[in-house]
């Protein structure tokens, strides 16, 4: 059971997953909000609520969520994005906390892409530390176009739909700057791991 929980966040295409993987190599359990969000949106009451609000156009023929269609809708419209978050986020938060507390390890990391947007510690009071992966906006843009095949316009919308770098940095206890050098991420993870282990067992 992990009583010490670190929230890991950063903008889209910032390298959160790469940093999380470095912590996993060190034996730290990582709970991924994106994975939990997909589980929450499987057929059931949350998906029913999504379909009731957005219509059947966000469903595939087999009744599962058409993630691409929904993503396009919510990135294009702030009100629709907020509506989706109101439907899904309470369930995601509950499951994240449950999974983090149940994790076996020296401490647990919970990767939460929209931590700043959700209100930081005010919304996640059970986080002991907040770790932000920071990346220049130009590099985010480039990664989205290369990694996800996003157009320049969609990449712009995806970045501006999220909190600003300044807002994310304002909630950070620790910051890792990711310029795409894996060795630097690995070194940062080892340094922070030693600190978090000490904090988890004072």
Swiss-Prot record:
Residues 5-202 form the DPCK domain. Catalyzes the phosphorylation of the 3'-hydroxyl group of dephosphocoenzyme A to form coenzyme A. Its main location: cytoplasm. Its EC number is 2.7.1.24. Belongs to the CoaE family. HAMAP family: Dephospho_CoA_kinase (MF_00376). It catalyses: 3'-dephospho-CoA + ATP = ADP + CoA + H(+). It is found in: Cytoplasm. The lineage of its organism: Bacteria, Pseudomonadati, Pseudomonadota, Gammaproteobacteria, Lysobacterales. The gene is coaE. It comes from Xanthomonas axonopodis pv. citri (strain 306). InterPro entries: Depp_CoAkinase (IPR001977), P-loop_NTPase (IPR027417). GO terms for biological process: coenzyme A biosynthetic process. Keywords: ATP-binding, Coenzyme A biosynthesis, Cytoplasm, Kinase, Nucleotide-binding, Transferase. The keyword Nucleus does not apply. The keyword Aminoacyl-tRNA synthetase does not apply. This is Dephospho-CoA kinase. It comes from the Bacteria. One of its GO terms (cellular component) is cytoplasm. Pathway: Cofactor biosynthesis; coenzyme A biosynthesis; CoA from (R)-pantothenate: step 5/5. SUPFAM superfamilies: P-loop containing nucleoside triphosphate hydrolases (SSF52540). Pfam families: CoaE. ATP binds at residues 13-18. One of its GO terms (molecular function) is dephospho-CoA kinase activity.
């Amino acid at each position: 059971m992990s009583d010490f929980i670190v929230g890991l966040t950063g903008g889209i295409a910032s390298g959160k997953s790469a940093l999380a993987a470095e912590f996993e190599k060190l034996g730290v359990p990582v709970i991924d909000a994106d994975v939990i969000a997909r589980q929450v949106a499987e057929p059931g009451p949350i998906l029913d609520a999504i379909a009731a609000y957005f219509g059947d156009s966000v469903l595939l023929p087999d009744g599962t969520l058409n993630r691409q269609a929904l993503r396009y809708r919510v990135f294009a419209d702030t009100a629709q994005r907020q509506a989706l978050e109101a439907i899904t986020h309470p369930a995601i938060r509950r499951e994240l906390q449950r999974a983090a507390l149940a994790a076996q390890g020296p401490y647990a990391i919970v990767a939460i892409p929209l931590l700043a947007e959700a209100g930081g510690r005010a919304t996640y009071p059970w986080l002991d530390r907040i770790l932000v992966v920071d990346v220049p906006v130009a590099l985010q843009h480039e990664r989205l176009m290369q990694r996800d095949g996003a157009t320049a316009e969609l990449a712009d919308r995806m970045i501006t739909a999220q909190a600003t770098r300044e807002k994310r940095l304002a909630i950070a206890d620790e910051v890792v700057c990711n310029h795409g050098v894996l060795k630097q991420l690995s070194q940062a993870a080892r340094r922070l791991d030693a600190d978090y282990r000490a904090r988890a067992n004072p």
